[in-house]
Amino acid sequence: GFVDYDESLEAALEREIQEELRVTLGPWRYVFSYPNRYEYEGILYKTIDAFFLTELYEKPAVIASDDVADTVWIDIQEIDLTRIAFVSIRNAVKHLQGGADAR
């Protein structure tokens, strides 16, 4: 999702997680950002994607909502990067998987 006008990254993160998964998580820790390009209605927007982490001690019950069709729990090392649409998210997952050339 996007950060609304006059909204902090942290507030947008909490709002988007609630809208998309119907769950409240946190506390969050900012880890890094990656540039991205997002095309909408024929216009190419340059954006910055911010990535945060939180620790889970148990799997919360999530409900796929809004733009989410389904959810699954998967080990980060098992994520198939070719199935991720946005370059910025592929780079972030690769970085978290420990890829040396991810940044």
Where are the language model's segments positioned?
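Nudix hydrolase/Nudix homology domain
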Residues: A61-R103
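Residues at secondary-structure transition points
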Residues: V3-S8, I43, V68, I84
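A short coil-to-beta-strand element that immediately follows conserved catalytic motifs
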Residues: V23-S33
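Short connector loops at helix/strand junctions that flank enzyme active sites
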Residues: E10, L25, Y45-D49
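Active-site-adjacent beta-strand/loop module that shapes the phosphate/pyrophosphate-binding cleft
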Residues: Y34-P60
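Structural detector for helix-capping/boundary residues
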Residues: G1, R15, W28, I74-Q77
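Conserved Nudix-box catalytic region and its N-terminal flanking loop in Nudix hydrolases
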Residues: G1-E20
